[in-house]
Regions:
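A short acidic, Gly/Pro-enriched loop at the edge of an enzyme's catalytic core
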Residues: 242-252
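Mid-domain Rossmann-like dinucleotide-binding core that forms the NAD(H)/NADP(H) cofactor-binding site
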Residues: 139, 146-148, 152-237, 241-242, ...
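Short Gly/Pro-enriched turn/cap motifs at secondary-structure boundaries
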Residues: 19-20, 53-59, 128-133, 139-140
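Cysteine-cluster motifs in flexible loop/terminal segments that predominantly coordinate metals
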Residues: 86-146
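Glycine-rich beta-strand-centered segment in the early N-terminal region that forms part
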Residues: 21-35, 48-97, 102, 110, ...
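C-terminal hydrophobic helical "lid"/dimerization subdomain
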Residues: 265-304
């Protein structure tokens, strides 16, 4: 099999012929048809994010066709078309069985291994690590079976490849994490892949208004197509003032889909619900006023 391998942050990826071991229990082999290019991979490739084992095959969102299944896999068979998600869960640990699968003890997407901590890819007998359990920058990959979500065989796999990260993160933030009710107001800061899907999620639950905020006005046409009722160009207008002019009191839910601390600190919301996208937010939250969580009753939560 071939894969684009990152040997060292800051260096170009190199296409290599790798050995791929057979799937173990609860694992499947997927022939990759399409891969998304996530900003998380860029952060890893350029060294902005550190601590990853090398060499590594990047790619945390993709779609393909199941080629082989390991023991105990019941919901998949060869020939199935699947979306690959970077956040599979084991379904067996304490957190999974108590309804908190986002804390799954075996899910370690940035540690480079599968659920047992080992890899299935190797080069000259040395391990090559899997990014986000998926490693979609490869012609084939072994992934946890729960990472592969079956879809209709007539769905375009190039389109489906995007669902495993930005769509599930953005829509899931609205429906599952924040549980935005119909009629609630919401603002989305950052109208990229995840922000657009927050907007789409808001439209699905009939939130109103849905305010898109970005410094690039060229993104607003598509934001409106997905459900934004208003758009604020933050390069021209103060978004806090603009949002308060539109809502009188600020929004009920503010979704921060861009990793800029000043955006979070603007506090352009009413009741303090601030779900954060899947970026390292610890430093950002540390920069908030110390009384923000207590005095204002704020809730800072990652989207996925």
């Amino acid at each position: 099999m071939q894969a684009a391998v990152l040997f060292e942050p800051g260096k170009p990826l190199e296409v290599e012929d790798l050995d791929l071991a057979s799937p173990q229990e609860d694992e499947v082999v997927v022939g990759m048809v399409a891969s998304g290019v996530c900003h998380s991979c860029l952060h890893t490739a350029d060294g902005s994010w550190t601590g990853f084992p090398m060499p590594m095959v990047l790619g945390d969102e993709g779609a393909g066709v199941v080629e082989e299944v390991g023991a105990n896999v019941k919901h998949l068979k060869p020939g199935d078309h699947v979306i690959l998600s970077w956040s599979p869960t084991c379904g067996q640990c304490h957190y999974c069985v108590t309804g908190r699968s986002q804390l799954c003890e075996r899910t370690v997407p940035m540690m480079g291994g599968l659920f047992d901590g080992t890899t299935r890819m190797s080069l000259n007998g040395q391990p090559v690590y899997h990014y986000g359990h998926v490693a979609s920058y490869a012609s084939r990959s072994v992934v946890p079976a729960s990472c592969a979500i079956p879809i209709r065989n007539d769905m375009n796999l190039r389109t489906a490849a995007l669902i495993g990260c930005s769509v599930m993160t953005g829509v899931g933030a609205v429906l599952n994490t924040a549980q935005v009710p119909a009629g609630a107001s919401m603002a989305v800061f950052g109208v990229g892949g995840i922000g657009l899907n927050c907007i789409q999620g808001g439209a699905l639950v009939a939130a109103n208004p849905i305010i898109a905020v970005d410094v690039n006005k060229d993104k607003f046409e598509y934001a409106r197509q997905l459900g934004a009722t208003h758009c604020v160009d933050a390069s021209v207008d103060n978004p806090v003032e603009a949002i308060r002019d539109l809502t009188s009191r600020g929004v009920d839910y503010a979704f921060v889909a861009v990793g800029v601390a000043d955006v979070i600190k603007q506090k352009a919301f009413g009741d303090g619900n601030v779900p954060l996208r899947k970026i390292p937010v610890a430093k950002l939250v540390q920069e908030l006023p110390k009384d923000a969580s207590v005095g204002l009753g704020l809730s800072h939560r990652c989207l996925s």
